[in-house]
């Protein structure tokens, strides 16, 4: 091979190698770009459509490392499509309740900027639990906290934090509200927020952070809602709302909401005479609520909601050990399932109960006349047998020497069953404690357990003499 041929051969080989390297670099670039954009798509096997991966739908981040020569590519694998909650699992079998959370808001207010609140409640999305309360537009160590005993002002807002995090200055104000309810349908939060004049209030329906619908007062007498979580089944959320007299006949309606839009309104039917401040829980395929009769009964009304056909029925808890305050003593009290007992029916307090076969679990103040102390127990036959009074598994949550307040239920879905939990509002300040000018609360939370448990008392615990006036 002469020198010219050698040069041509070497040149050809070099050109071939350069071409191959160039093509490899193009392939690497194409692969990189493809994988980069591919991470923002999910293939839905059900309808073979390409669905965008929204950040709110990502349950966990999984990183896959792919090596191509010296290039490292990070690819986020798309999670399964988020679905509506259906709450079809059975209710957990429990022996009682175990301590879960306590926020100590009043004690912390003695040395920090903590919101003045009342009407707290708890609700959970599929991953976390959150605490809510109606703020008074002020912190406790602030002169605006004077006279915060009043329920309805334009400054009240719905506050939301992770459970166990007190309502500090960085707390999110979800909406304007002096009455509220919240629930998560599996995809996003729904907040029902009532505010405005007593005779012409507005309920706003906020879904996924956006105002979707609203409704005005229908009886011009303090439109109000649950002050605890609503319930969503297969994308339909139900909320109980009342407008009318707090000590006489009122107009209660059950609203059915889908992604924030009111799709149906059903009037209350059945034998319940007065219904407000309901504590609701999923009882697949429907929703069941235990409410407050502020007119005729110290036994609690039951509202059963059929989510499929929008029908409503109502009655009263059968247990002769009744749940409202004020009430007669346990020897004298009664309940016969269908009607109010006409025993100290005027006034009352928000509370809860839930059925367990023929039995009923319930909570109530220890005092028969005031919001002091708190206890839970099970009544054998209390769901099905009129005036049943056999009590078992009693627990003291707050001893009788300390104040309590509202209480309500929330549900938590586990791997195999749905657990029932409750919170107790621990009110401090006015009217009873006149050294200070404010009224606020902390909370304590318990959940059902199938295990064993001990005893104790979990009051608010703040020394009123150490608190700002």
Swiss-Prot record:
PTM statement from Swiss-Prot or TrEMBL: N-glycosylated.
Involved in apical transport and lipid raft association: annotated segments: 11-33
Enzyme active site: 151, 406
Cofactor or coenzyme needed: Ca(2+)
GO molecular function: exo-alpha-sialidase activity; metal ion binding
Region (Hypervariable stalk region): 36-88
Membrane topology type: Single-pass type II membrane protein
Transmembrane feature ranges: 10-30
Catalytic activity: Hydrolysis of alpha-(2->3)-, alpha-(2->6)-, alpha-(2->8)- glycosidic linkages of terminal sialic acid residues in oligosaccharides, glycoproteins, glycolipids, colominic acid and synthetic substrates
Virion surface-facing ranges: 31-469
Residues that, per the record, bind substrate: 118, 152, 276-277, 292, 371
Binding site for Ca(2+): 293, 297, 324
Region spans: Head of neuraminidase: 91-469
Entry-listed glycosylation sites: 61, 70, 86, 146, 200, 234, 402
GO biological process: carbohydrate metabolic process; viral budding from plasma membrane
Subcellular location as annotated: Virion membrane; Host apical cell membrane
Keyword terms: Calcium, Disulfide bond, Glycoprotein, Glycosidase, Host cell membrane, Host membrane, Hydrolase, Membrane, Metal-binding, Signal-anchor, Transmembrane, Transmembrane helix, Virion
Intravirion side: 1-9
Gene Ontology CC: host cell plasma membrane; membrane; virion membrane
Subunit structure: Homotetramer.
Comment on protein domains: Intact N-terminus is essential for virion morphogenesis. Possesses two apical sorting signals, one in the ectodomain, which is likely to be a glycan, and the other in the transmembrane domain. The transmembrane domain also plays a role in lipid raft association.
HAMAP family with a match to the protein in the record: INFV_NRAM
Other noteworthy facts: The influenza A genome consist of 8 RNA segments. Genetic variation of hemagglutinin and/or neuraminidase genes results in the emergence of new influenza strains. The mechanism of variation can be the result of point mutations or the result of genetic reassortment between segments of two different strains.
Family note: Belongs to the glycosyl hydrolase 34 family.
Name of the protein this chain belongs to: Neuraminidase
Encoding gene (name): NA
